[in-house]
Amino acid sequence: MNAIAPTPDVRQHILDVAHPLLLQRGFTGVGLAEVLAAAKVPKGSFYHYFGSKEAFGEAVLEAYFTEYLGRTDALLTEAPGTAAQRLIGYFDDWLDSQTGDDAQSRCLVVKLGAEVCDLSESMRAALARGTRGITDRLARCIEAGRADGSLQPPPQAKEQDAQGIAVALYQRWLGASLLAKITRDRASLDMAMRDTRQLLGLSPDT
């Protein structure tokens, strides 16, 4: 019997269906049978698209970062305004996504990061690649802000390179998002925004 050729649309459909399930209950909390039932794909066909649940989890993360980095590019490079304004727009979008009603906009890194890094090296590597893609984009926007004069960092930050500042900001927002999830309170995210403006040398009305 001939093998069934993988169909990209079906593969993407499985990933799309799995995303909200994983956001809700995590990787280990969602069974393969549940994903297949939601996607209406038979178990036998699943293995034409993913060799294992681990490979499936890696593919979910890669699909998430592809979409997320595209949105990040739109906010940090394609949006109008100065580089400083684009940076604040990016973090405004982050804050809105973590406090709004759309559960599917939540950060998959916050949900899965600590859980899967000890379970799967391939998923940990996918997370590392994706998060590096984010901090690289933030660093480029910080460099653009220094070039266009819209970012004037305070004295304590002037010696830091753009990549170091980008990583510090990303760490701050990841931690704030996790704390907001634990406390069900946005105070940590509002504090992250204040800290971001301070680190970048921006006034509250930028």
Question: Where would I find each of the regions flagged by the language model?
Answer:
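Amphipathic C-terminal alpha-helical segment
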Residues: 97-100, 118, 144, 169-187, ...
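N-terminal intrinsically disordered/low-complexity leader segments
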Residues: 1-9, 154, 206
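Amphipathic alpha-helical segments used for helix-helix packing
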Residues: 86, 100-123
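Short, basic, alpha-helical segments at the C-terminal edge of helix-turn-helix-like DNA-binding modules
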Residues: 62-68
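Hydrophobic alpha-helical connector segments
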Residues: 59, 73-105, 158-169
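Helix-turn-helix
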Residues: 2, 13, 17-55, 59
